[in-house]
UniProtKB/Swiss-Prot annotation:
Function, as annotated: Catalyzes the cleavage of 5-oxoproline to form L-glutamate coupled to the hydrolysis of ATP to ADP and inorganic phosphate.
Pfam families named among the record's database cross-references: LamB_YcsF (PF03746)
Reactions performed catalytically: 5-oxo-L-proline + ATP + 2 H2O = L-glutamate + ADP + phosphate + H(+)
DNA-binding found in the keyword field: no
HAMAP family: PxpA
UniProt name for this protein: 5-oxoprolinase subunit A
Enzyme nomenclature, EC number: 3.5.2.9
GO molecular function, a single term: ATP binding
The keyword Iron is assigned to this record: no
Family in the record: Belongs to the LamB/PxpA family.
Keywords assigned: ATP-binding, Hydrolase, Nucleotide-binding
GO biological process: carbohydrate metabolic process
């Protein structure tokens, strides 16, 4: 019997701000199955968010909220000393903004995924993770919560489950992994991958259940969705290469599902 492999392909997007464009959503969205939309705190603005919701709906994408720290200058990738209460409120506020546009456009929220430094913090800081999960459970309990694939996501997955949330695991074909299955620091040489062919090769491996680490080892990695970063200058080329490579290796792309 042949086993059919299926995965979701998502990207962080909707990140333009006013007169300053970032990424190429018009060319990227047709290549995806899901999208994580910036909500104005780390990137994006109301007009960009509304336009991104419309574009995602046109292409039948699963739409996800991508809340981050209130840090436009640092693109949400710097740690901020927000309290758990502030994290909960900021998460509710940002998801609420997306919910408004989804209501207007007749869409539904598929998932929630934290951005940047907040994403890392809720995986490592239990109180922060509790606050984030509580906000999601309060407002959109039907949405999937995205966590890191591998050991790095295990604690947050347990916290999410305790709040009655459904978890989906995410892997990054254009990011390097350490020997313990965690994302390599962006400060390390080779931590970010810009070659579409290499990202595609890694995506196929991830769909098959493994990832090659910085040290060259092959590590088991179970995941449900692949993520690329829309601010990567090669994002469109990477997404296209991944789609082609997955198809060539018998992997079907589909939105997140039970």
């Amino acid at each position: 019997m042949t086993t059919t492999l299926t995965t979701d392909l998502n990207a962080d997007a909707g990140e333009s701000f006013g007169h300053w464009p970032l990424g190429d959503d018009a060319r990227l969205f047709p290549l995806l199955t899901s999208v994580n939309l910036a909500l104005g705190f780390h990137a994006g603005d109301p007009v960009t968010l509304h336009s991104a919701v419309r574009l995602a709906r046109q292409h039948g994408l699963g739409i996800g909220a991508h809340p981050g720290y209130p840090d436009l200058v640092g693109f949400g990738r710097r740690e901020l000393a927000l309290t758990p209460l502030e994290i909960q409120a900021a998460t509710l506020y940002q998801i609420g903004a997306l919910q408004a546009f989804l209501t207007v456009e007749g869409g539904t929220l598929q998932h929630v995924k934290a951005h940047g430094a907040l994403y890392m913090r809720i995986h490592e800081d239990r109180a922060a993770g509790e606050a984030f999960c509580h906000a999601v459970q309060q407002l959109v309990p039907q949405a999937y919560l995205i966590v890191l694939a591998g050991a790095a996501g295990s604690d947050l997955a347990l916290t999410a489950a305790a709040h009655g949330l459904r978890v989906r695991r995410e892997a990054f074909p254009e990011r390097a992994y350490t020997g313990d299955g965690r994302l390599a620091s962006r400060q390390l040489p080779g931590s970010s991958i810009h070659d579409p062919a290499e990202a595609a090769r890694r995506a196929v491996g991830m769909a098959q259940g493994w990832v090659q680490t910085l040290g060259g080892e092959r590590l088991a990695l179970e995941m449900d969705t692949l993520c690329i970063h829309g601010d990567n200058p090669q994002a469109v080329a990477i997404a296209g290469a991944i789609r082609a490579a997955l198809a060539e290796n018998g992997v079907t792309l589909a939105r997140l599902h039970d």
